[in-house]
Amino acid sequence: MAALLEAMPDLTVDAESLPTIRQLFAALAAGPEPDGLDATEHTVDEAAGIVLRVLRRSETAASPRPCVYWIHGGGYVIGDRRMDDVRLAAWVRALDCVVASVEYRLSPEHPFPTPLDDCERGLRWVHAHADELGIDIARIGIAGLSAGGGLTAALAQRTKGDTSLPVIFQLLDSPMLDDRQVTPSSRADWLAVWSRDSNRFGWASYLGEHSGAETMPEHAVPARATDLTGLPPTLVLAGGADGFCDEDVEYATRLNRSGIPTELHVYPGAPHGFTMFPGSSLAEQADRDVIDWLRRQFER
């Protein structure tokens, strides 16, 4: 665990550091294309910059493949569609699925609801173009990490009951769900990777004029939703040393109480974003759990 923490960057994100951190993440994401896979780019809205990166096996499938619609993390303020290529490519190889990773506009330049709107538009594009992508429209689920997990939860809330946009699951990896920072884990002073101050900046950037308000627009903050019925089966991953741990466990508990088939995995000692480092034993265990769960969802 100590080696993992040492390898992870200390991200103190604020208005001053944001441009530099964005450049760092862009450089890290600019790696080679995944071996043995087709990686294609599809423009949803050129003016808005909404782009989908689609990963799939090179060989033609005998039947349409299931799909994971992926929303990247970055505190609502950093990141891009390529940053999780290594991890997502492993899912494609293990499950013979298609992964579509969406590029959405970032805050603070584009506060709520723009990022969520972009994610919804990308998902609608995937549904509309499922045939040409070789996707089984009856086996599309949504997933995301950190802020992407928050957007995934919000997207599931927004689209529940929408028969034109069915999703069969939501996978929430260390999701950023609650702007209030009132849980014990969110108040810890030893948080690695994503500090309390960075979290405050991320939420303020995303919520814009609504930041700090007692009430929020619908679907802006997933943890503030009062009705969680009708959501799809859910997997929640939480790191025991993540500031989001308590809010993630609480959200999973609320889903379970609302009758949603919910699986919760808490990884002792894991900091925020640990699944972004596939060489660590914790990340490898988490992805074994994820692949097992995804396989079960696709086979239902």
Annotate each PLM feature.
Residues 82-101:
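Short amphipathic alpha-helix adjacent to the substrate-entry channel of hydrolases
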Residues 1-57, 298-300:
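A glycine/proline-hinged amphipathic helix-loop "lid/cap" segment
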Residues 279-300:
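Catalytic active-site module of serine/aspartate enzymes centered on a nucleophile-bearing elbow/loop
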Residues 110-132, 290:
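Alpha/beta-hydrolase active-site loop
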Residues 127-142, 162:
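Gly/Ser-rich "nucleophile elbow"/oxyanion-hole loop immediately N-terminal to the catalytic nucleophile
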Residues 157-213:
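Hydrolase active-site cap/lid region
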Residues 144, 148, 152:
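Gly/Ala-rich beta-loop-alpha elbow adjacent to hydrolase catalytic centers
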